[in-house]
């Protein structure tokens, strides 16, 4: 696979995972997710990960 294919595959997998977690939250809480905020966590070598905050209505 080339870089673009790998990037597209990763984006699709991440989007599917987020959609699955939103559905689980909706089902388990009976409330809707109103916002998801991603904050980059960086090191000197570059992006390490993200902190995620979810708001539920």
From Swiss-Prot:
Q: Which domain of life is it from?
A: Bacteria
Q: Which InterPro entries match?
A: Gns
Q: GO CC terms on record?
A: cytosol
Give the GO molecular function terms.
identical protein binding; protein homodimerization activity
Q: What does this protein do?
A: Overexpression increases levels of unsaturated fatty acids and suppresses both the temperature-sensitive fabA6 mutation and cold-sensitive secG null mutation.
Q: What's the family? A: Belongs to the gns family.
Protein name in the entry: Protein GnsA
- What organism, scientifically named, is this protein from? Escherichia coli (strain K12)
Q: What is the lineage of its organism?
A: Bacteria, Pseudomonadati, Pseudomonadota, Gammaproteobacteria, Enterobacterales
